[in-house]
């Protein structure tokens, strides 16, 4: 399924709204990942031996903002480019680091759930099934691009 004009508009409009609060939403996004899958904490070197709350961890804050922005911005470009657009070196790096950390399909699903919950909370009563479907499609395409790089890296 391609990314439709309507899906692009839904993602773009909600992203424009969410951009006003990226630091807070990014922390919420990562907090949800850790809430859904507490063992994910061990996948991040800056969280492994820490009992700090996510909002008190500057490395997590920086990482959360980077991941959240990249996820959302790649979704915005999906319709225009017809594919996930992340710099080639960035995509290769993402594939490599995800392979190194032994990220598997269930991990991608946790991140997807956290993303959808974050967008739902941020957009409030604007959240509808079609917005959920739009963000799901956008995320699935990003996850597929990362997985393809993981497979390429593993085969090399």
UniProtKB/Swiss-Prot annotation:
Binds 1 heme group per subunit. Heme b binds at residues 45, 59, 63, 98. It holds the Pfam family Globin. It comes from the Eukaryota. One of its GO terms (cellular component) is nucleus. One of its GO terms (molecular function) is oxygen binding. Residues 2-151 form the Globin domain. It is found in: Cytoplasm; Nucleus. Homodimer. This is Anaerobic nitrite reductase HB2.
């Amino acid at each position: 399924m391609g990314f439709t004009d309507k899906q692009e508009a839904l993602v773009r409009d909600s992203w424009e709204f969410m951009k006003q609060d990226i630091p807070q939403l990014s922390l919420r996004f990562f907090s949800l990942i850790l809430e859904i899958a507490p063992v994910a904490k061990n996948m991040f070197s800056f969280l492994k031996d820490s009992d700090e709350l996510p909002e008190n961890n500057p490395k997590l804050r920086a990482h959360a903002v980077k991941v959240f922005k990249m996820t959302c911005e790649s979704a915005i470009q999906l319709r225009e480019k017809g594919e996930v657009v992340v710099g080639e070196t960035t995509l290769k790096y993402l594939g490599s680091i995800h392979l190194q950390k032994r990220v598997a399909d269930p991990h991608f699903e946790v991140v997807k759930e956290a993303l959808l919950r974050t967008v739902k909370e941020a957009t409030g009563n604007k959240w509808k099934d079609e917005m959920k479907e739009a963000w799901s499609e956008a995320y699935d395409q990003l996850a597929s691009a990362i997985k393809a790089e993981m497979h390429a890296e593993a085969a090399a």
